[in-house]
Amino acid sequence: MRGMWLLAVLLLAGCQHVAAPPPIGGQIRDLHSGQVLTAQQLLARLAEPDRVIVGEQHDNADHHAAQLWLLQSLGELRPQGSLLLEMLTPDQQAKVTAVRQSVSPPSDLSGALAWQEGWDWKLYGPIVRFALTQPYPLLAANLDNGEIRAFYRNPPVLSGERSNAEAVKTILLGQIGDSHCGLLPDSQMPAMLA
């Protein structure tokens, strides 16, 4: 009888699923507290909010591998509503929809999506390929280049009690600079507020 209990415990333990850690070295650190997190702690924290914004250093392969791991792992913990990518513009959305509706993926997926050369397909391709196989929508989250240039040339006038306050602009400029690792030229910063 004791052997049966041991066997049952071992079988049940084998059914427990724990996401594998991200396929990269280094530490996961909470930038607000400095606390080092395990992969499981990170997933537990990110599974709670309705929306998660994930960024990367655009040319860092480890960041992209971690993003793919995170997308796959969160999908096992909770339903995903959608995936929005800064790399996709509204004029590409119909192409994304066509690829999703096709019976088999095109041999040249980046070409079928009219993927922009500025976003290295070798790094972003695995994330896009995975997202296209999921039940949730893959959506464009950027503006077309013409729209961006129009905002830069003629920024809209914002209304609201605090929208134009210098303190708010200073905070927003700081966040924009931080989210781009301090790599944006100062001359581009004011236009980013548009």
Residue ranges, per PLM feature:
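Acidic/histidine-rich, surface-exposed loop or edge segments in extracytoplasmic proteins
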Residues: A47-Q57, S107-G111
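Bacterial N-terminal signal peptides
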Residues: M4-G14
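Solvent-exposed, acidic/flexible segments
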Residues: Q35, A39, D59-Q67, Q93, ...
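Active-site-proximal beta-strand/loop segments in catalytic clefts of secreted hydrolases
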Residues: G55-Q57, L85-L88, A141-D144
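Membrane-embedded segments
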Residues: N60-A65, W69-E86, P90-R100
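N- or domain-start disorder-to-order transition segments that initiate the globular core
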Residues: G14-P49
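Short, well-ordered alpha-helix to beta-strand connector turns
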Residues: G25, P49, R78, Q134-P135
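A substrate-binding/cap region within the structured catalytic cores of diverse enzymes
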Residues: S82, A94-A194
